[in-house]
């Protein structure tokens, strides 16, 4: 009997994968609540780390928020896909090493001075990029081969000035077919309340 995975690709996942095929170094992913952008990006990164040599930094404005969100989701997906044991997890450093593929992933908060400077990475993923400064973005992304950033469309910020037709996608909850009926109803109710 085969296992039914809880974490499966959504329309968001496929749209992001197609976007990443473009000839760009920077990819900007906007999406509201329930769009599935973070889970989709983490699934793509986990697949990369499990099949390819590479070094990845996943970061956000605050390390405590990152631990409660993206790090926790990363672990849940790896466990669900039965690949968690492929990684050596250093929980005090928030790092994952796949010794078979010689791949490495670290989770860092950008709330410590100079923490993002000097890292050479294959991929840098900035979760909730609208909560970091342009200088923090420049520091963490300067030596990266590929940069992915996501954000909720709350207000205009520095990333909007970096958007091109080849590096941007806008997702919404309709791109996440695994969203619960209750969450869909909640999101659609926001419209009637004029949020």
Which residues fall in each region the model found?
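Phosphate/NTP-binding elements of NTP-utilizing enzymes
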Residues: 1-195
């Amino acid at each position: 009997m085969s296992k039914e995975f809880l974490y499966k690709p959504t329309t968001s996942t496929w749209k992001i994968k197609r976007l990443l095929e473009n000839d760009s170094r920077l990819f900007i992913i906007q999406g509201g609540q329930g769009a599935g952008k973070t889970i989709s990006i983490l699934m793509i990164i986990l697949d990369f780390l499990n099949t390819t040599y590479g070094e990845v930094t996943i970061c956000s404005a605050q390390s405590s928020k990152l631990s409660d969100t993206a790090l926790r989701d990363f672990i849940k997906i790896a466990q669900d896909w039965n690949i968690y044991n492929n990684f050596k997890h250093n929980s005090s450093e928030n790092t994952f090493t796949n010794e078979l593929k010689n791949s490495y992933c670290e989770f860092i908060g950008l709330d410590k001075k100079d923490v993002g400077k000097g890292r050479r990475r294959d991929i840098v993923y900035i979760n909730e990029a609208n909560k970091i400064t342009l200088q923090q973005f420049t520091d963490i992304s300067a030596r990266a081969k590929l940069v992915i950033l996501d954000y909720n469309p709350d207000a205009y910020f520095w990333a909007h000035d970096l958007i091109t037709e080849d590096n941007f996608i806008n997702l919404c909850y309709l791109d996440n077919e695994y969203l619960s009926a209750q969450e869909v109803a909640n999101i659609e109710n926001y419209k009637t309340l004029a949020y």
